[in-house]
C-alpha cells in the first residue's frame, strides 16, 4: 500500500492537527510519525490506524 502524504496533510488540516498531535493520537513519537508519513509503503494495520485517528476511510489516504 502506498501512503499519500498530500492526502494525509489534507485530512490533518481538516482536523486542525499537527504532526505532533497526530503522533500523540497514534501513540508514537513525532520522529516516528515523520518516518511513517515520509515512507511510501505502509502496512495495512498502520494505514488503518492512521485513518482511524484522522476519522477518514483508509482509501482516502492511499495513492490510487
Residue ranges: model-predicted function:
Residues 1-21, 25:
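A short, Lys/Arg-rich alpha-helix, primarily the initiator
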Residues 13, 38, 63:
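Residue-level detection of the helix-turn-helix DNA-binding "recognition helix"
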Residues 19, 30, 44-47:
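Helix-turn-helix DNA-binding elements, focusing on the entry/boundary residues of the two helices
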Residues 27-42:
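Recognition helix of helix-turn-helix/homeodomain-like DNA-binding domains
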Residues 39-52:
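Short, basic-rich loop-to-helix N-cap that marks the start of a DNA-contacting helix
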Residues 55-64:
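Short C-terminal boundary/hinge segments that cap the last helix of small helical domains
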Amino acid at each position: 500500500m502506498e501512503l499519500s502524504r498530500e492526502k494525509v496533510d489534507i485530512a490533518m488540516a481538516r482536523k486542525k492537527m499537527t504532526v505532533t498531535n497526530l503522533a500523540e493520537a497514534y501513540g508514537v513519537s513525532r520522529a516516528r510519525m515523520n518516518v511513517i508519513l515520509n515512507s511510501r509503503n505502509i502496512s495495512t494495520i498502520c494505514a488503518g490506524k492512521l485513518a482511524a485517528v484522522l476519522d477518514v476511510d483508509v482509501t482516502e489516504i492511499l495513492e490510487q
